[in-house]
Amino acid sequence: MSGKINILMLGGAKRVSLAKIFKSAGERMGKGVEIFSYEIIPSVPIACVGTVLDGSRWGDADIYDKIAKVIKEKEINIILPFVDGAIEICSKLKELHPDVFIPVSDFAVAHSMFDKVEAAAVFESHHFEIP
């Protein structure tokens, strides 16, 4: 990784504080941190600390191609999901872009955990108590 770290955030709230923390940590490490956020609405608070990119809905057929283009054009090093729907997207992106750090589980686990009934069945099969 060079002297610059580019982070792509996918959806969600409360990202401004985290973006500021990432930038501060980058400064301490002697690296510039640039924040990008993939949005369907351009006027979001993250715009005060990063660049808002025109995004697609999670269910759009071409979302992987569009994010792949962002990864290449913006030289993205890290992708972080901030909403449940983005976790499954990120698990697929992790398979498609192994050079990008994407801290999510594999698609099967992400998919199971997104569905509460399916998640409960997985927990029960491993003898976890479910409240």
Give the residues covered by each predicted segment.
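A conserved helix-loop-beta module that forms one wall/lid of the active-site cleft
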Residues: 96-131
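ATP-binding N-terminal substructure of ATP-dependent carboxylate-amine bond-forming enzymes
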Residues: 1-106
